């Protein structure tokens, strides 16, 4: 299934794409795509509904983040060896974990606000993993059983705040609008191997990132198992799993960063695309 949330910010309704790619309204069946709705049992109930029987959503509504009421938005850094090299950092021996504040979450096509005074706002296309069941101390072999589905994430980052101002990644990762998620939550049954997904990103039509999740340092299963040893993962938590090379700060001979008035387009095979305009934060 391809699940989504549509409507104005803070008023999103749950929906599903039908066979023709049209949005159907799920709000008569579930209040939101959040919490226990994302469990195996909750998704099985949605799967039993014939989308053709649901109300058709007219027009072109705003698409919100594909998960509501996210409890934890967990980032993984330097999870592609070639990205670590372009960043001038060693390949990690254990996952680099940081938090993205949930207030950074926005829809996949909402604008990106460049923070006041920023000259180092950067892009990162990433595979997002949505947890579907409470998860603590799980084995790698069973880790994917706890996944509800997958989505596209742009891990927008302000490099001065991330690296130069005390070295705390959280500070550079959590500005408002720095967490576009979606457009869809694609359930795990439709993604047989999360380590075989092409991902890409363009700025104003120029392709900067081309990668595949097979080159991750730590696989999705390894990340879930690792994180579950130091925290309890809950339904609706989102893990964004790192980016391939091609980010702005790694461009030679001179880094390239986002400016107001640009268009950012990114996507992952089978998971959809995002399109964001950049603007100065007010």
From Swiss-Prot:
Chain sites annotated for binding Mg(2+): 124, 126, 155
One BP term from GO: urate catabolic process
GO molecular function: hydrolase activity; metal ion binding; ureidoglycolate lyase activity
EC number: 3.-.-.-
Gene3D superfamilies: Fumarylacetoacetase-like, C-terminal domain
Cited Pfam families: FAA_hydrolase
Cofactor: Mg(2+)
Matching InterPro entries: FAH, Fumarylacetoacetase-like_C, Fumarylacetoacetase_C_sf
Keywords: Hydrolase, Magnesium, Metal-binding
Family: Belongs to the FAH family.
PANTHER family linked to this entry: FUMARYLACETOACETATE HYDROLASE DOMAIN-CONTAINING PROTEIN 2A, FUMARYLACETOACETATE HYDROLASE DOMAIN-CONTAINING PROTEIN 2A-RELATED
Name this polypeptide is given: Putative hydrolase BceJ2315_61450
